[in-house]
Each structure stands twice: as structure tokens, then as C-alpha cells.
Amino acid sequence: MFKYIGDIVKGTGTQLRSLVMVFGHGFRKRDTLQYPEEQVYLPPRYRGRIVLTRDPDGEERCVACNLCAVACPVGCISLQKAETEDGRWYPDFFRINFSRCIFCGLCEEACPTTAIQLTPDFEMADFKRQDLVYEKEDLLISGPGKNPDYNFYRVAGMAIGGKPKGSAQNEAEPINVKSLLP
């Protein structure tokens, strides 16, 4: 008999403790946001929409090395290389299927020219899957992105617009390798 009374007291205590917890949470600040009217806080390194950036000179940074497509775990990036008269590579087409993209950021890490960058833009919803396939024209932005002073071809040692090799920033004079032969 006393066992049953103990169970009743224990159950009543559990119920009262639950009610106190519910009423206590009723007066706390709400975590829910009215989304379109109230903007969501995004952390500083939030990975959202992928963009292609330009050099400080206004040229495309992408050199079509295909490292981003190889690094992508879901295979949503496709591109094809083309070459200008002066030997500079650029993507003939660059396509990202955002319906497959998981926004992991591996393409940004693999890019040697910092051409691919992830922005905090996340509002990309659409009614048709075909509209989530972005071409190069949709991805290119007019600015340099996160690294405004970086120019891959000035650092890589390729002659720029009539300047001889060795005159770019932090670049040593070219070495005549034939003089090193015995």
C-alpha cells in the first residue's frame, strides 16, 4: 500500500516539475524569427552562393584548371578550358548545378587563383530545377571578392602585356637554364 502512495507522490512531483518548466519557458525570449521581415544572423564564415570573381584588371580569375570540379564531392561543377592568343587559359563554359551543391566549400579551397568564392547569400529558391543550373555569366561578379589585390598571372610568372618576365610583384629575374649545363 505504501508503495502505491510513493508512486503517486513521485508521479505528482514529476508532473509539477514539468509544469514549472513549461511555464518558465513561456516567459523567455523567443528563438523564432519572422524571416522575411527579420534578417537571420549569419556567422562570418557562412558558406552560401558560389560566385566567380575577377582580377583587379577586370579579367576573369578562373584559369580552367578543373581542380574545383575534381574536388567537388557531388560533381555539380563542369567546365571546359579555352586559351587566348597570349597563352592565358579561361573557361569556355563554367556551369554549377545548385540543386546538387551541398555548399561544402571544397571548390573554394581547391582553387589556386581564388576565383571561386562562397558568399553569405542563401536565398536561391526556385520553382524549376533547370533554373538552379547557373552558367558563367550568372556566376561572374564585377568585383575581386575577398582578395582584392591578388592577381594570379602577376604572381605566377607569366609575361604581362609586353612586360618581360621578372618584372612582376615578388618575382625574381628568370634564370637561363642553358648556362647551368656542363
Swiss-Prot record:
Locations listed in the record: Cell inner membrane
Pfam families found in the cross-reference section: Fer4_7
Cofactor binding comment, as recorded: Binds 2 [4Fe-4S] clusters per subunit.
Protein's GO biological process: aerobic respiration
Catalytic activity: a quinone + NADH + 5 H(+)(in) = a quinol + NAD(+) + 4 H(+)(out)
Topology versus the membrane: Peripheral membrane protein
Cofactor(s) needed by this chain: [4Fe-4S] cluster
Binding site for [4Fe-4S] cluster 2: C72, C101, C104, C107
Cellular component aspect of the GO annotation: plasma membrane
This protein's UniProt keywords: 4Fe-4S, Cell inner membrane, Cell membrane, Iron, Iron-sulfur, Membrane, Metal-binding, NAD, Quinone, Repeat, Translocase, Ubiquinone
Transmembrane segments: none
Domain annotation 4Fe-4S ferredoxin-type: ranges: 52-82, 92-121
Annotated function: NDH-1 shuttles electrons from NADH, via FMN and iron-sulfur (Fe-S) centers, to quinones in the respiratory chain. The immediate electron acceptor for the enzyme in this species is believed to be ubiquinone. Couples the redox reaction to proton translocation (for every two electrons transferred, four hydrogen ions are translocated across the cytoplasmic membrane), and thus conserves the redox energy in a proton gradient.
HAMAP family per UniProt: NDH1_NuoI
Protein name stated in the entry: NADH-quinone oxidoreductase subunit I
